[in-house]
A protein has these predicted regions:
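Active-site-adjacent substrate/metal-binding segments within catalytic domains
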Residues: 23-98
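Active-site region of glycoside hydrolase catalytic domains
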Residues: 2-42, 85-87, 95-473
């Protein structure tokens, strides 16, 4: 038996959820519309109702957390459940629901880490010519919504503004498989990320000026980018350009308060290739700069990495949303082509499994952005086609995936990175935005017909790690 590795005292072992992916009740109890409602209905592939029925079943899930040693839970507030029209009239039933949820969490010792916008900006901001966060008035609306939540839900001490701004930009304007989406519009992708980062910055300043107490940060899907051939200058440049899209643009905004010259140069070049311009104003930079001292924490969602090689040609991206292994393609003009390095495994959805990439990413944040304060791994997990036999789910590949990533987190901590917690994605099986219900991530299996929960083998494994603070490598 190898020697166990010890997590620091106070390390959070959490599970992650998101409102639209777990709550169900998407058009009831006073909730307003979000773009996904009509988009998914038109596709007809799968419905977000009832998802995990968390709106009604959350006491069951919080009890499972308590029984399995999980002491933190990522949840999000559905903006349109509070403000059905984005602004104006408040839905008191939605406010009461979240108070009850947070009270249940806190009473059970399962501390809530709450995100304000997790891919479900209200539909109202896309009407009458609106384009969501591409329309600057949405920035101000978000800040007002955030201020309401800070003042109303004072029982919450851990806040995140947004979940995965790069993923939002990718789904909306690169892959184009999200509502109101367009393909290969890098100009709009960068602009969307910029506007959302300005909204984040203004909300962070409002939080600290309001003296609400606790901490606030942002969650980003950060993804290491590697040249397929590290000795090939063109491959290195392809990796650098991909890194600007996914990582540097949002990290610079968060921890520099502006965009480094080479970051801006790369973004401008890609925007021009897409036929557009960027609108980065002096007052935007002032807002980013004002938030610099107040970014208390960074949430890192991490699943995979990307290997890039230089290539010329036209855009060609195919998203694997079915689990048909080998069906994904990623070729972006001005960047290059994504590929798989020989010997590196992938999931059925073509996500590259490379846990060492998380270590590289964490050390990179520490070295390139030394003013960061703390990091939470806010999502990490493996989508898997779980088998179900007599109530037992043997998900050994998921355990191995988690074990490897946790080991690299410990190595990063040993290297001086301040990582305060880990939230497995996901707490329970959930609705997936582009995969529906066949791509399962949960520690707890859900029979979606009966809504009964079953602990998987990974839940028992994670319970042991959480309760002992020890990882057997």
């Amino acid at each position: 038996m190898t020697n166990p590795m010890q997590f620091p005292d106070g390390f959070v072992f959490g599970g992650a959820t998101a409102a639209y992916q777990v709550e169900g009740e998407t058009r009831t109890h006073g909730k307003g519309k979000v773009p996904w409602d009509d988009f998914l209905a038109a596709q007809g592939r799968f419905s977000p109702d009832p998802a995990s029925d968390f709106y009604n079943k959350y006491p069951v899930d919080i009890d499972l957390c308590q029984r399995f040693g999980i002491n933190g839970i990522r949840v999000s507030i559905a903006w349109s459940r509070i403000f059905p029209n984005g602004t104006g009239e408040i839905n008191s039933e939605g406010v009461a629901f979240y108070h009850e949820l947070f009270a249940t969490c806190n009473k059970a010792g399962v501390i809530p880490y709450v995100t304000l916008d997790h891919f479900d900006t209200p539909e109202a901001f896309y009407q009458d010519g609106g384009e969501g966060f591409l329309t600057r008035t949405t920035i101000d609306a978000f800040v007002e919504y955030a201020k309401f939540c800070f003042a109303e839900f004072t029982e919450v001490k851990h806040w995140f503004t947004f979940n995965e701004i790069p993923a939002t930009a990718e789904g909306s304007f690169i892959v184009g498989n999200w509502p109101h989406g367009e393909k290969y519009r890098l100009d709009k992708a960068f602009q969307l990320m910029h506007n959302m980062m300005v909204a984040h910055a203004k909300a962070v300043v409002a939080f600290h000026e309001g003296g609400f107490g606790g901490e606030i940060g942002i969650v980003q899907n950060l993804e290491p980018k590697y040249p397929l051939d590290p000795n090939n200058a063109a491959d290195c440049e392809a990796a650098r350009m991909a890194d600007v899209i996914n990582n540097r643009w949002v990290l610079d905004a968060t921890f520099r308060g502006h965009y480094a010259a080479d970051t801006m140069e790369a973004a401008t070049k890609l925007a021009h290739i897409a036929g557009g311009e960027l609108d980065v104003r002096d007052e935007d930079i002032a807002a980013l700069t004002a938030a610099l001292p107040y970014n208390d924490c960074l949430g890192v969602n991490t699943y995979k990495c990307q290997f890039l090689r230089a290539a010329e040609g036209e855009n060609d991206i195919n998203h694997n949303g079915t689990g048909d292994k080998g069906s994904s393609r990623w070729f972006l003009k001005g960047v290059g082509e994504a590929c798989v390095r020989e010997g590196v495994p992938t999931t059925d959805w073509d996500w590259i499994i490379y846990p060492e990439g998380l270590y590289d990413l964490l050390l990179r944040i520490k070295n390139d952005y030394p003013n960061y304060k703390k990091i939470y791994i806010t999502e990490n997990g493996m989508g898997y086609k779980d088998g179900f036999e007599d109530g037992f789910i043997d998900d050994a590949p998921r355990i191995d995936y988690m074990r490897q990533h946790l080991a690299w987190i410990l190595k990063a901590i040993d290297g001086g990175v301040n990582v305060d917690g880990y939230f497995v994605w996901s707490l329970q099986d959930q609705f997936s935005w582009t995969n529906g219900y066949n791509k399962r991530y949960g520690l707890f299996y859900i029979d979606f017909e009966t809504q009964k929960r079953y602990p998987k083998a990974s839940a028992y494994w994670y319970k042991n790690v959480a309760e002992t603070g020890l990882l057997m490598a």
